[in-house]
């Protein structure tokens, strides 16, 4: 993994089988691939859980944004265990409070409400990355 020292790592939960997990992964991809590819990089949580040396080293050398679908906070907890610095912990489940009655979709396909939640959370994550890159960590 190159350039991780300068880039913020975005680590979503795996969240297999849950719409919140799909939202977490889509938020990570939107931040890292679409909004701020020059400032961010994604890291697969499974590599970190497995103890992959390269993944652990990247976590220790980088600032991170974790994105968790549920209250188990797997991404957040594993980044902390690996010694990472967490700029922001985004919790998808909490976002549903701002979207009461939303019909986000399923574990495999997001509907319009789900994409709106992704967009809102990606804006939060991107804002955090930009603040950090300007030295104004929130």
Protein language model regions, located:
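Iron-sulfur-associated redox domains of electron-transfer enzymes in respiratory
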Residues: 1-138
């Amino acid at each position: 993994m190159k350039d991780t020292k300068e880039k913020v790592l975005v680590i979503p939960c795996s969240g297999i089988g849950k719409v919140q997990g799909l939202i977490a992964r889509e938020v990570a991809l939107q931040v890292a691939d679409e909004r701020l590819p020059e400032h961010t990089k994604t890291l697969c949580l499974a590599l970190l859980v497995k103890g992959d040396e390269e993944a652990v080293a990247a976590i220790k050398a980088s600032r991170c944004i974790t994105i968790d679908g549920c209250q188990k906070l797997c991404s957040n907890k594993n980044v902390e265990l690996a010694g990472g610095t967490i700029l922001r912990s985004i919790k998808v489940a909490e976002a549903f409070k701002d979207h009461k009655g939303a019909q986000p979709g399923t574990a495999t396909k997001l509907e319009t409400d789900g994409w709106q939640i992704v967009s809102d959370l990606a804006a939060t994550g991107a804002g955090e990355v930009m603040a950090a890159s300007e030295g104004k960590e929130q």
